[in-house]
From Swiss-Prot:
The gene is wbdB. It comes from Escherichia coli. GO terms for biological process: O antigen biosynthetic process. This is O-antigen chain mannosyltransferase B. It catalyses: alpha-D-mannosyl-(1->3)-N-acetyl-alpha-D-glucosaminyl-di-trans,octa-cis-undecaprenyl diphosphate + 2 GDP-alpha-D-mannose = alpha-D-mannosyl-(1->3)-alpha-D-mannosyl-(1->3)-alpha-D-mannosyl-(1->3)-N-acetyl-alpha-D-glucosaminyl-di-trans,octa-cis-undecaprenyl diphosphate + 2 GDP + 2 H(+). Its EC number is 2.4.1.349. Belongs to the glycosyltransferase group 1 family. Glycosyltransferase 4 subfamily.
Length: 381
């Protein structure tokens, strides 16, 4: 079996899709069933899996400003959308006996043996959670991927059912390959976490934690409103720590963040390096994730793997991931979310049960299983 794997999602900052791509390709590279693995980036082959580095210098900042400018040019974006898949197809013209896997929705133009991973279809079902330019771009490109793919992988049974329902896609051509988290996410002692806690000026089990992109789909505004309902004494004892890449703008959200920061019960850490995250999770009192829509919900799996109680929403894929280990609520019910957060902070009996159940639930997910399921899916072609 010969595979070409697209590596574009493996870049800083490493999103959930980037993490999936990185963990999967590392294991495909050593899988016995894979006779040959080629890495494809942009429209050319590369020799090594990309390194994820913090691009915080001025050169990277200039690059980011250039990309932001280009994204505001609809004609350039449309030209890229039309031409780039054809450039890729031309570069792949002599590799018809390979299976091509695009792990982030997109595929080159008209390949004979193409697999794509659809992580969710919120661009179609909940377009209000995305910038309009992203919706315009992805709607067209994802329809083309659906037409081109001989097989679709997806990361949850929820996402699989959504694709079948919305697009009437053949069920035998969609395979669920559930995600996992890094082996770095394990329970840790206060001493192990101390360097990271000191770095961010935090206390062991002295905070509630949210990790994820700061964007409307994640319902962070609802989370802040729910947290604001807690007694001020509780909020000051357990401040809400927010960490994640700043997504598309939500002015009301940032006004709430700034207000909570002034009052002393919110801190926004920005994008935290990967090497710090397992310790930031493991030292938290509780993890909160009341998202409106998820294709999987990797952060709650990471939290459970660290032995941290979880409060999350009861919609889309999240119940599938959390099982009976966490407290779940309607993401629109701020009062219920607030009550669950309070219980997760103060109810020691429930916390002990939630920790044990979370660790057991997390063991059901592994990158080895994901890789095996992916390779078995390749065999269907």
């Amino acid at each position: 079996m010969k595979i070409i794997f697209a590596t574009e999602p493996i870049k800083y900052p490493l999103t959930g899709i980037g993490r999936y791509s990185l963990e999967l390709v590392k294991r495909l590279a050593v899988a016995r069933e894979i006779e040959e693995l080629k890495l494809f980036h942009g429209a050319s082959f590369i020799d090594q899996i990309p390194q994820v580095e913090n691009k915080s210098d001025s050169k990277a900042s200039n690059h980011g400003r250039l990309l932001a400018f280009l994204r505001r040019q609809p004609l350039l974006i449309e030209a890229y959308r039309l031409l780039h898949p054809r450039r890729q197809a031309w570069a792949l013209r002599d590799y018809k006996d390979y299976i091509y896997h695009g792990p982030n929705f997109y595929l080159p133009h008209r390949l004979e043996r193409a697999v794509t991973t659809f992580h969710d279809i919120s661009i179609f079902t909940c377009p209000e959670y995305h910038p309009k330019d992203r919706v315009r771009y992805m709607e067209k490109s994802l329809h083309e991927s659906l037409d081109s793919a001989k097989l679709i992988l997806t990361v949850s049974d929820f996402s699989r059912s959504e694709i079948i329902r919305l697009f009437n896609y053949p069920a035998d051509r969609i395979v669920t390959t559930k995600l996992a988290c890094s082996s770095d996410y394990i329970p840790r002692s206060p001493a192990e976490c101390l360097p990271v806690l000191q770095k961010y000026q935090l206390a062991w089990q002295g905070y509630a934690l949210y990790i994820g992109t700061m964007e409307p789909r994640k319902n962070i505004r609802g989370l802040l409103q729910a947290y604001q309902l807690l007694p001020m004494e509780t909020r000051m004892r357990y401040p809400l720590i927010l960490s994640g890449y700043r997504g598309w703008e939500d002015d009301v959200l940032w006004q709430l963040v700034e207000r909570g920061t002034r009052e002393g019960w919110i801190r926004y850490l920005g994008y935290v390096p990967d090497e710090d995250l397992p310790y930031l999770y493991a030292a938290a009192r509780t993890f909160v994730y009341p998202s409106f829509y998820e294709g999987f919900g990797l952060p709650i799996l990471e939290a459970m793997s660290c032995g941290v109680p979880v409060v999350c929403s009861n919609v889309t894929s999240l119940p599938e991931v959390v099982g009976d280990a966490g407290l779940v609520a309607d993401p629109n019910d701020v009062d219920a979310i607030s009550a669950h957060i309070l219980q997760s902070l103060q109810d020691d009996s429930w916390r002990e049960i939630a920790t044990a159940r979370g660790l057991a639930q997390a063991k059901q997910f592994s990158w080895e299983n994901c890789t095996t399921q992916t390779i078995n899916a390749y065999k269907l072609l």
